[in-house]
Amino acid sequence: MIDEQRFLELESIVKNMVKVGIVESFNQNNATARVVFEDANLKSYDLPIMVKQTKDNKDYWVPDIDEPVICIFLPTGIESGFILGAYYNQKDKPPVIDQNKRTVKFKDGTIIEYDRKQHKLTADVKGDIDIKATGKIDINASGAMNIHSDTSINITAPKIDLN
């Protein structure tokens, strides 16, 4: 039978394995952040931020300062842990409420969205778009294609075919 002291130690470890906090600072060189846990009046060490991939394909996402995050810690304490990610709350709500849409909304108002029900990709960019390819670029549409500019359209190539 487990004695009361060991039970209390185990309970303390489990209670401190998952914590909710606010990002206080970000270390760009290491892609780590420090988190403040107001419920315990504690501050973490620099914590790695969980991402989808880091080896051959790389995914980069970092939380903003003052963003609420969920952290998980190893049983050794808040010296060793990870930021799992951010979460929506009453202050910071989702950009859309539709299970058929995958949406990324940036601070400047730029939105990139895919609607799987409508089969439509939308990019509403509040700035320039730069597309580069080391190979060819094909744009095909089974419907009409429209190109509009409020100023000018420049096409530069050794050969231009219009049919």
Identify the meaning behind each predicted range.
Residues M1-K117:
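Exposed beta-strand/loop interface patches that mediate assembly or binding
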Residues M1-Q5, E9, V20-I22, K132-N163:
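Intrinsic-disorder/coil detector with helix-boundary
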Residues T32-R34, F82, T122, D130, ...:
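General beta-strand recognition
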Residues F37-D39, Y87, G127, G135, ...:
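A short beta-strand motif that forms part of the nucleic acid-binding face
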Residues K43-S44, Q53-T54, E79, D92, ...:
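A short local loop/turn or secondary-structure capping micro-motif enriched for an aromatic residue
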Residues Y45-L47, F82, P94-V96, D124-V125, ...:
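A short, polar/proline- and glycine-enriched secondary-structure boundary/capping micro-motif
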Residues F73, I78, R116-Q118, V125-K126, ...:
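Trimeric beta-solenoid/beta-helix "fiber body" segments of extracellular/virion adhesins
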